[in-house]
Curated annotation (Swiss-Prot):
Claim: Oxidoreductase is one of the keywords in the record: yes
Originating species: Mycobacterium tuberculosis (strain ATCC 25618 / H37Rv)
Protein name per Swiss-Prot or TrEMBL: 3-oxoacyl-[acyl-carrier-protein] reductase MabA
Description of how the protein assembles with itself and partners: Homotetramer. Homodimer in solution.
Coiled coil stretches, renumbered: none
Length: 247
């Protein structure tokens, strides 16, 4: 079958209402700025620091269901129902397994996994009603193949993968997709603070022989938020310089 010009044409751009949780710094900020540059209406959540210039900010703690609801209500009043959700907010609290307290384990799960559930559940209301939605979860390579001293963090990110795939199946009939972007070693304040020996050791396992940039993660999110990605759902896309060889 020969494709026509129309079949091969790029779909028209549609400006969407976007919410990026934890979009005031690091990878989240790069994502928010890229989506705004693409032409979307972008809101970000923060914990009291305020929103970067050019972005609409709402204060929100994703571990608090009421705060999540208030944040969504504010975004809806400002720019309409959330059509693209980027669940990025989270934290880490690394420790050796024998020294990791149950409190530390549950704190990370509550922020990274249950927090992602809270925002996804709230976003699903309007997405199902309007028969359109893009949910993009920021995971980690740790969630696919584990990293020492990160039992809590790895468990939370592995859980995000399972949750995203369940959402992808459940909400497909409402034209809602759900995908995970899994960054590897990315140049952020956290990685720059690591001991030089640790940084060099990590590079040994990266075929690209360099750290990634937040902008490179943002580029993948930009694609998943676009009309070009309408047939992609339930995917886990690593941005890791080949470290996990696609896993």
């Amino acid at each position: 079958m020969t494709a026509t010009a129309t079949e091969g044409a790029k779909p028209p751009f549609v400006s969407r209402s976007v919410l990026v949780t934890g979009g005031n710094r690091g990878i989240g900020l790069a994502i928010a700025q890229r989506l705004a540059a693409d032409g979307h209406k972008v809101a970000v959540t923060h914990r009291g620091s305020g929103a970067p210039k050019g972005l609409f900010g709402v204060e929100c703690d994703v571990t608090d269901s009421d705060a999540v609801d208030r944040a969504f209500t504010a975004v809806e009043e400002h720019q309409g129902p959330v059509e693209v959700l980027v669940s990025n907010a989270g934290l880490s609290a690394d420790a050796f397994l024998m020294r990791m307290t149950e409190e530390k384990f549950e704190k990370v799960i509550n922020a990274n996994l249950t927090g992602a559930f809270r925002v996804a559940q709230r976003a699903s209301r309007s997405m199902q009603r309007n028969k359109f939605g893009r949910m993009i979860f920021i995971g980690s390579v740790s969630g696919s193949w584990g990293i020492g001293n990160q039992a809590n963090y790895a468990a939370s990110k592995a859980g995000v993968i399972g949750m995203a795939r369940s959402i992808a199946r459940e909400l497909s009939k409402a034209n809602v997709t759900a995908n995970v972007v899994a960054p590897g070693y990315i140049d952020t304040d956290m990685t720059r603070a690591l001991d030089e020996r640790i940084q060099q050791g990590a590079l040994q396992f990266i075929p690209a022989k360099r750290v990634g940039t937040p902008a490179e993660v943002a580029g993948v999110v930009s694609f998943l938020a676009s009309e070009d990605a309408s047939y992609i759902s339930g995917a886990v896309i690593p941005v890791d310089g080949g470290m996990g060889m696609g896993h």
